[in-house]
């Protein structure tokens, strides 16, 4: 009673097709696919922005006195 066999699922699918029709189900499937695609693109663009923010390095000024001291020690 806890699990359904393949026949139960086929009967449910047949009833759903009869109630909604194949055109509505096709439209629903394409809408769902478009939503998933949009979600993936949004996540991908957010990841790319985060990566580019981490790769950005700030310019540093090297003090000439420290550089001269390092050369005089060698």
From Swiss-Prot:
InterPro entries: TatA/B/E, TatA/E. Keywords: Cell inner membrane, Cell membrane, Membrane, Protein transport, Translocation, Transmembrane, Transmembrane helix, Transport. It is found in: Cell inner membrane. It holds the Pfam family TatA_B_E. It comes from the Bacteria. One of its GO terms (molecular function) is protein transmembrane transporter activity. Part of the twin-arginine translocation (Tat) system that transports large folded proteins containing a characteristic twin-arginine motif in their signal peptide across membranes. TatA could form the protein-conducting channel of the Tat system. Belongs to the TatA/E family. The lineage of its organism: Bacteria, Pseudomonadati, Pseudomonadota, Betaproteobacteria, Nitrosomonadales. Its main location: membrane. It is a single-pass membrane protein. One of its GO terms (biological process) is protein transport by the Tat complex. The Tat system comprises two distinct complexes: a TatABC complex, containing multiple copies of TatA, TatB and TatC subunits, and a separate TatA complex, containing only TatA subunits. Substrates initially bind to the TatABC complex, which probably triggers association of the separate TatA complex to form the active translocon. The chain crosses the membrane at residues 1-21. The keyword Transport applies. GO terms for cellular component: TAT protein transport complex. This is Sec-independent protein translocase protein TatA.
């Amino acid at each position: 009673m806890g699990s359904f066999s393949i026949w139960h699922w086929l009967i449910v699918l047949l009833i759903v097709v009869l109630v909604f029709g194949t055109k509505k189900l096709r439209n629903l499937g394409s809408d769902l696919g478009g939503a998933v695609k949009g979600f993936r693109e949004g996540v991908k663009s957010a990841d790319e922005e985060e990566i580019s923010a981490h790769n950005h390095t700030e310019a540093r000024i090297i003090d000439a006195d420290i550089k001269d001291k390092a050369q005089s020690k060698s």
